[in-house]
Amino acid sequence: MCARRFLFLIFFLTLIMVAGAFAVYQFGASTLTRMATPQGRYEPPSPRSGPDYKLASSWLARPGIADNPAAWVPDGVVTTIATSPAATFYIHPTTYLDRDRWNAALDPGGDAGFRARLFVQSQASAFNAVSDIWAPRYRQAAFGAFLLKSEDATKALDLAYRDVRAAFDAFLAAQPAGTPVILAGHSQGALHLSRLLIDRRAALKGRLVAAYVVGWPLSVSADLPATGLPPCNAPDQTGCVLSWQSFAEPANPSLVLDSWVGSRSASGVERKRDDMLCTNPLNGARDGDATPDTNLGTLVPNGDLASATIAVGQVGARCEDGFLIVNGRIPPLGPYVLPGNNYHVYDYALFWGSIRADVERRLAAFRA
């Protein structure tokens, strides 16, 4: 990786950590807003500019794509491809930082495209032992769209979601009848996934192994009822939702809480402080506690971030007040943990091996 990309990636991850999720609204008048908010008003794209998800070029990962980033595994991990795989639909987080538009191009290329592949490689790969992985390109809302509660920002997020929904419909249409479905997303991707669970509730009935809605807060009583799905309370439960947000001690999630508590779900229900969903990915239980020896592998990136090794049995975690608090011997993951000890960027990497085992276990239970 060239030095320019490396430095730009640090800048990107730093912004995501400081301003990710609901926390970014706290910086409305700050330098961050001036630096990142898209210039001008939102302008709807031409109807003909939308993606065609019948084309392989509209996907970052799907069966048959050469140099598929979702097929990656860290050194020392052996993957046995399932003879009758499930299908995973994965939605990547924000990777577009420029201010020239409210939504990225379908294939933004350059650093934004590189970062999207990096997230598919490090996150979606956790599901590749049991499933084909489909990861769409989509006209993601630019990072700055999260900095404002404005009509323009809402329109940008809605456009991104419409692409995701269209991609999901194409994904589902391509699956043989009865194929088990796994859903996963992170940050902006998790936000879109939370909407998809509502809009495609009927299509998912009887087919969903689990939904991994990671790095975006969910209320059990305000958000989940509209999906018709329960939280995953046990490691072999299926047709349920997992969600977590990772912090280390001393944790200070006030930036997330200040904007989330009291906000309302799509159905108008107020979100309450004591109702945030936390699943422990180490044991698959809601509000669970797990010691470091139960962690089947943390991804530790190499110097240029192009690959990673697995560190087993080093990081434990417990759910506390709706957040996942990590402990143990956290390996050096990079300089991206910022104020509040928020490990947002590492929500998947910290537990990669255990997420891999979790989905294998739930799929086995689904097929039993």
Language-model region placement:
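Loop/turn elements at helix/coil->beta-strand transitions in domains of secreted/extracellular proteins
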Residues: 84-86, 129-133, 177-180, 206-210
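Surface cap/lid and interfacial helix-loop subdomains adjacent to catalytic sites
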Residues: 2-9, 37, 165-177, 198-336, ...
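Short extracytoplasmic
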Residues: 42-71
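Active-site catalytic motif of lipid deacylating hydrolases and related acyltransferases
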Residues: 27-48, 53, 91-179, 327-368
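Structural recognition of the beta-strand scaffold that forms the well-ordered cores
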Residues: 87-90, 134-137, 182, 210-213, ...
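Gly/Ala-rich beta-loop-alpha elbow adjacent to hydrolase catalytic centers
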Residues: 183-193
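Hydrophobic membrane-insertion alpha-helices, especially the h-region
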Residues: 7-24
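Extracytoplasmic/periplasmic/luminal assembly and interaction segments
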Residues: 60-98
